[in-house]
Amino acid sequence: MQHGKHAITIDGVRQVFHVFGTGPLCLAHPGGPGFGWEYLRMPALEQHLTMVYLEPIGTGDSGRLPARRDYRLDVWARFLHGVAEHLGAPKVLVLGHSHGGFVAQRYALEHPDTLAGLILYATAPVLDADFWAAAMSNLELFPQQHPDQPEAAGMFGAYQATLAAPDDDAITHGLRRIMPVYFADYWAHEGRLAPVRAALRAWVDPLHGEEPAPFDVRRQLSSIATPALVLTGEHDFLCGPRWAAELHDAIPGSQLTILERSGHMAHLEEPEAFSRAVAGFSAKLPAR
C-alpha cells in the first residue's frame, strides 16, 4: 500500500487516513474526541506493522457532519469499518487510543467477524460520572507529584477550561497547555516531547456529540472472542490500571500490559517497550 495520505468517501463524507510502515495492517484510531491524528504516530511500531492512522471525521482534512450532535461512537465505528472495507483485507488489527478505544470497543462488538485482533490502549469500558470523578481526583494530585514544576500548579483549572473551549483555536491552545498531565513526567523528556506538544491540534465539534446513553459496555465485553491486548501506563490519570484491569477481566483470554514509566501516552514515553508489546501480540495472531 502506498505510504502517505489517502481519502475516500463514506456516506457522502470525506474520510482521510494516513499509511506508514510495513507488515500486517493495523488500523489506529486516535483519542479526543477531536484530537488531530499526528500525536499517535508510532515510528517504532511501523517497523513491524503497516499502520493506517485514521483522521477522524470532524478533525483535520476529514469531512464534517451537518450537526455536531451526530458525532457519536457508532458513527465513528461506521467510518472505521468503511476504511477497513476499502482496504480489502479479510480481517484487520484495530488499535484504539483513549476515546479511540471506545470506538474500537464499539467496532469490536458490531463487527466481530472483521477483526484479527483488538488493542485497547489507555482506554476504559465505561464513561460515566464515576470515571470522571476518579480522573479529576487523580488530576488534583498532579501539582504534588511535580512540586518543582511551576507549570503543574494550574493544570486542574486549565483542564476544565479546555473541556469548555468554545472553538477550535481555544481547544488547541488548551490541549497544548495541559499536555504534561498525560505523561508520567513530561519535563524529564521535554526536549523530545516539546515538538509534539507544539504540533498538537484539536477540533471542538466532536466534543458536542450526543450519545443516546453514557458509554458502558462492561456487560457486553464477554462476547468478544477476538484476541485482545489491553495496554496502559502505570501513571495514567485518566485511563490507568484500574480501567485496564476491568477490560482485561471482562474480555476472555485478553492480555494485559502495564508500562511502569508511562502515563496516558506510552507510545511517546516508552516507545520501544510499547512497540515490543504490540508487535509481540500481533506476531501471535493468525496470518492475515
Where are these regions (language model features)?
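Acidic catalytic loop of the alpha/beta-hydrolase fold
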Residues: 235-238
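Conserved hydrolase catalytic core segment
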Residues: 90-134
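Alpha/beta-hydrolase
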Residues: 139, 151-219, 226
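Flexible "cap/lid" loop of the alpha/beta hydrolase fold
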Residues: 118-161
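Active-site loop/oxyanion-hole signature of alpha/beta-hydrolase fold enzymes
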Residues: 53-99, 276
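Short beta-strand/loop motif that positions the catalytic acidic residue
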Residues: 224, 230-232
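Catalytic active-site module of serine/aspartate enzymes centered on a nucleophile-bearing elbow/loop
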Residues: 254-288
